[in-house]
Amino acid sequence: TQHANLVNNYYKPGPTTDLLRDRRCYRIARIGIYGQNYDNGEGFEPFKGIWGRFYIDGNYMFGNADVTADNWTDGVYAQQEDNDGNDYTWESEGKSVINNGSQVVDVKGVTTHTAEAAYEQVLKYVGACNYRDTYDKFIMDEVAERKATCNIQGSNHKLGYINHPSELVGIVEGVDENGYPVLVQVADNDLADTDGDGIPDYWETQYGLNKDYAADGNLKTVDENGEYTNLEMYLNSLVQDIMDKCREGGTVVE
């Protein structure tokens, strides 16, 4: 990343990080460059040797009041040093130019919370589905309580690392012998989809669509701005209440 805003993030190192006892325990970011020896295709050539500009502010480091109060000194500057990877230009150039002092990316329409508030919102609402299964709940509890229940010994295993669901058999409730959640199937007559376009009949009727016309799922008539398909609008409606709650208490960047 050449330019980025890193604002109001909540860092909570886990129990394994405690064992490191090094600067990774309080790292906000380790900023580097593509050095002249970096070889990953011609597309990277224009970016070699160029230090980016960053706006880093308001980030919270769990258990470290100094880094929370001052993100840069230990959280960023102390994380890097002159080395072959940055062409030994950190001290002579990088360290003095990466702190932009103000936003480097123009952001509009983004809801922002304080780091502490964002952390609470994530624990409540993060996820890729409109409900949480037994694993979602397990992970959220691990984060909230700062636990590392999984502790399988062996190569490539570390405290709290989960390499396969089977490692949690007997630890997480509601999973099968392979460690996968047992999902309950529920028949719902309201989810009839006559035309098979992925949108239930009840929703098509509610929003003036034709339940016998499959092609309208790909039209953009429901979105007043004409940007999202009707199918996308239906899918978003399944989690609209969650999205609304995510934004509560935040400030919209104009």
Q: At which residue positions do the language-model features occur?
A:
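Short, well-ordered loop/turn and helix-capping segments at boundaries between secondary-structure elements
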Residues: 11-16, 61-65, 145, 205, ...
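Extracellular calcium-associated, cysteine-rich motifs in secreted modular proteins
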Residues: 175-254
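Glycine- and acidic/polar-rich repeat regions and solenoidal domains
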Residues: 1-104
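A generic "cationic amphipathic patch" detector
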Residues: 19-22, 72, 152, 216-217, ...
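Long, contiguous hydrophobic alpha-helical segments, chiefly transmembrane helices and signal peptides
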Residues: 1-11, 139, 143, 199, ...
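Intrinsically disordered or highly flexible coil/loop and linker segments, enriched in small
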Residues: 65, 148-153, 240-244, 248
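Short, well-ordered coil↔helix boundary/capping segments
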Residues: 46-53, 129, 133, 190-194, ...
